[in-house]
Amino acid sequence: MKKVFYSLFAAFVLTACGSEKQAPIDREALVARNNPQVASFDSLASLSVGNGEFAFTVDATGLQTFPSMYSKGVPLGTQSQWGWHSFANPQGYKSEEVLKAFDFGRGHEELYACQFKEEGRQKEASDWFRVNPHRLHLGIVGLELGEGVKASDITDIRQTLNMWKGEITSHFTLNGNAFDVRTVCHPDQDMISASVTSRAHAGVNLRFPYPTGAHADDACNWDANDKHSTTIVRQDAQSAVLKRVLDETTYYVTLRWEGKANLAEKSKNYFVLTPDEDMLAFSCLFTPNFQGTVFESEPPVYADGQVLPSFTETAAASASYWTNFWTNGAAVDFSHCTDPRAGELERRVVLSQYLLAIQSAGSVPPQETGLTYNSWFGKFHLEMIWWHQAWQPLWGHTDLLDRTLGWYETVEPVAREIARRQGFPGVRWMKMTDPNGTEAPSNVGSFLIWQQPHFIYLAELVYRSNPSDEVIQKYNKLVQETAEFMYAFATYDEFHGRFILKGAIPAQETLRAATTINPPFELSYWHFAMQTA
């Protein structure tokens, strides 16, 4: 029966999409016909450039000129994998304070990180650990168009995201002056480069917010200037370095511009780069550390700063990276399909690859909202990595998944401690977490288990794309440690002579851990992972 079904299905696909022998796919044409186009200010139509480690999202001007207009839609984020912050902890909350003991009939006590709801220190502690750390908005980079200019003053908007090159081109008119903006992201640095051409000599502003610590928002608190600072620590005729200090968090913003321009502080945490010419080209790099030498004096001297790539160099690097991305790996051309849904399906396939490559392919697992804005305080959920990244080895981009899986090794000691305090060997992968592997307290997340087999599944995908001893040696230790926990977590049912799963909340998150036995998805996934390991 299965063979008959698959034969009929294949015949249907070939009929719908044309069964005649096709020439090789014109990949550039495939990508180009799906390039997003924007012709107005639309808070749900922001565009992004990025590299998996860093992403920069813009409005219809090609930069982040009107962030408040987009804050309730798809916000104009500047986010990285390293940019995190924690509010002060004067009460000295400790992670042990959010642990609660449970007995699920496995012969030992199990300690889970819970979210306490009753007023008191435990609630305060669990609230603090859920909020902290949170991901930072690293800074707004927008056009300085003049006092009182509104989005409604701008006309003749024509904007395109060229996914083949990773470049956003934006054209618009303001007060009779035409503006042309090109925006790119460097493939190997947390840096954007842009060129702005206009007879209006419009400047570029850099504005820096304090974090909100909110569950889901653009992470921009513009009413807390007294809680953070931005200072120019190094400047010459073509570059400057700004130092950001937010509580215990410090990072740096390095600028390089071409031609004559002047950088000045307009107000606290607000700087403007003003050109003397019709074109302003600049690069803006965000780093956790100063890229040079710091001489500890009073005040400190910042020397030998990094010389940033120019706009032209960054645009060339971006085009090279994206051309290579699209040229290699899988591609599907739906242009010969007669089904009326084919065009939309093709658009989603192409755009999804671009978005997931810039938002969900970094050195740590992806946030559910990528690097655009904060959800769940900017933290990532390990059960969701499958949706973001399982496609990568299947579509010939194994290297993207490979660099993310390395994170699991760095947090292995944390995962081992979670398993230990619950009375199990091996490692138990956390659900809601951050780059350090800190387990966020939750009355649901801490009891989920469907994230546990993911590591084995994803490592298997890497192996299938490159079946070698090298891959086995790289991942086998963590695969076995993951399986060791899974074996111990399963309870032997002596009456029925079988192993069962209990004391866990299923993926749909509505059932209770104390009364759930053998959730079918988790049970089948456990079986697959144990066989694979």
Regions found by a protein language model. Name each.
Residues 367-378, 425-472, 481-533:
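The feature captures the catalytic groove of carbohydrate-active enzymes
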Residues 349, 382-427:
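Carboxylate/His-rich catalytic cores and anion/metal-binding grooves
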Residues 356, 385-401, 453-468:
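Alpha-helical support elements that line or immediately flank enzyme active sites
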Residues 19-379, 398, 408-414:
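Acidic/polar, glycine-enriched structural segments that form the non-catalytic walls/loops
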Residues 15-16:
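C-terminal motif of bacterial Sec signal peptides marking the signal peptidase cleavage site
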Residues 27-29, 35, 206, 369, ...:
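Beta-strand segments within the central parallel beta-sheet cores of soluble alpha/beta enzyme folds
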Residues 2-8:
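Sec-dependent signal peptide recognition
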Residues 355-360, 400, 404-419, 477-494:
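Long, well-ordered core segments of solenoidal/helical folds
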